[in-house]
Amino acid sequence: MTRLKEKFLNEITPEMMKKFEYSSIMEVPKIEKIVVNMGIGDAVQNSKVLDSAVEELQAITGQKPMVTKAKKSIATFRLREGMPIGAKVTLRGERMYEFFDKLVNVSLPRVRDFRGISNKAFDGRGNYTLGVKEQLIFPEIDYDKVSKTRGMDIVIVTTANTDEEARELLTQFGMPFQK
């Protein structure tokens, strides 16, 4: 069992039960999944760009990414329906906890001028979205092999009903929110 999963079961769950006065242990919110998405607009002109992005995403998450395709054709972007334009990974279970642990304790502190992440990125239903500007903050990415810096979106889906519960859950897990 991963370190964060143990922490969740032994420390966070009782703390949340006390704070929000849940009647059942099943009411305590938990992280359901983490979706890491990389939109690669350059893939329209050059399909090799997509391959390197997929490799990087696989190195970061430890899971093979799914290539996302365009839903609509957009003439101004020279984009046709069905063209590959991105990659995404949905993490659940052990891999999810390992990725979250690495994100909070290793990657986010490596961001330049890091003062904590925004409190305002909750969606109203207890999910948190985080944008990362460059993939170099992850320890698996070799600086010399990177052809282009790419950003990614990280969505943390929780079972929390409100943003307040979700914020408390992520804070307990060690997410560095701005004060």
Curated annotation (Swiss-Prot):
SUPFAM superfamilies: RL5-like. One of its GO terms (molecular function) is tRNA binding. Signal peptide: none annotated. GO terms for cellular component: ribonucleoprotein complex; ribosome. InterPro entries: Ribosomal_uL5, Ribosomal_uL5_bac-type, Ribosomal_uL5_C, Ribosomal_uL5_CS, Ribosomal_uL5_dom_sf, Ribosomal_uL5_N. Keywords: Ribonucleoprotein, Ribosomal protein, RNA-binding, rRNA-binding, tRNA-binding. The keyword Ribosomal protein applies. GO terms for biological process: translation. Part of the 50S ribosomal subunit; part of the 5S rRNA/L5/L18/L25 subcomplex. Contacts the 5S rRNA and the P site tRNA. Forms a bridge to the 30S subunit in the 70S ribosome. This is one of the proteins that bind and probably mediate the attachment of the 5S RNA into the large ribosomal subunit, where it forms part of the central protuberance. In the 70S ribosome it contacts protein S13 of the 30S subunit (bridge B1b), connecting the 2 subunits; this bridge is implicated in subunit movement. Contacts the P site tRNA; the 5S rRNA and some of its associated proteins might help stabilize positioning of ribosome-bound tRNAs. Belongs to the universal ribosomal protein uL5 family. This is Large ribosomal subunit protein uL5. It comes from Macrococcus caseolyticus (strain JCSC5402).
